[in-house]
């Protein structure tokens, strides 16, 4: 997993509350066992005017030009600004996978659904919680200022606006450590590789009948 330390990026405003995981990545795209290939279908039902299908050539599909991510000014956005209860609905790691592959590395919202919140951290996506008042002000500034960017410092736990105002956010110390060091569940396990190998050796010696060579 790629480490997250600091990021300065263009902000895209998704001014909708209660965005669920089926809206983030619709169910028909969940058939793949790979964790790649979901970015092109992020928010598929909003980005396109037709019904998308797996392995379809999206370049030939009709775009919904009213949807924010199809606006020219938000192309290349890497910070998603959202409303409350983002990521509600069924559990699917495909949701943070799709957001990351599209190009987002952080989300800012007043609140998140618990499962999506946890899945985001495990997949290197930083979900930042700010107050509703702070988020409201960000929406106003983003829409009034083309090219609006935010600077995120995970170590300092701050989001800095273009006008210099610094917004602070809270984050669990363990999750912060994992993001700063690029540690997912596999990475954390590998840190104890020597201890695991030692246990397996002792276990094999004490109960050899459990093993087949």
From Swiss-Prot:
Its EC number is 4.2.1.33. It is an enzyme of class 4 (lyase). It catalyses: (2R,3S)-3-isopropylmalate = (2S)-2-isopropylmalate. One of its GO terms (biological process) is L-leucine biosynthetic process. The keyword Acetylation does not apply. Keywords: Amino-acid biosynthesis, Branched-chain amino acid biosynthesis, Leucine biosynthesis, Lyase. Catalyzes the isomerization between 2-isopropylmalate and 3-isopropylmalate, via the formation of 2-isopropylmaleate. Heterodimer of LeuC and LeuD. Belongs to the LeuD family. LeuD type 1 subfamily. PANTHER family: 3-ISOPROPYLMALATE DEHYDRATASE SMALL SUBUNIT, 3-ISOPROPYLMALATE DEHYDRATASE SMALL SUBUNIT 2-RELATED-RELATED. This is 3-isopropylmalate dehydratase small subunit. It comes from Pseudomonas savastanoi pv. phaseolicola (strain 1448A / Race 6).
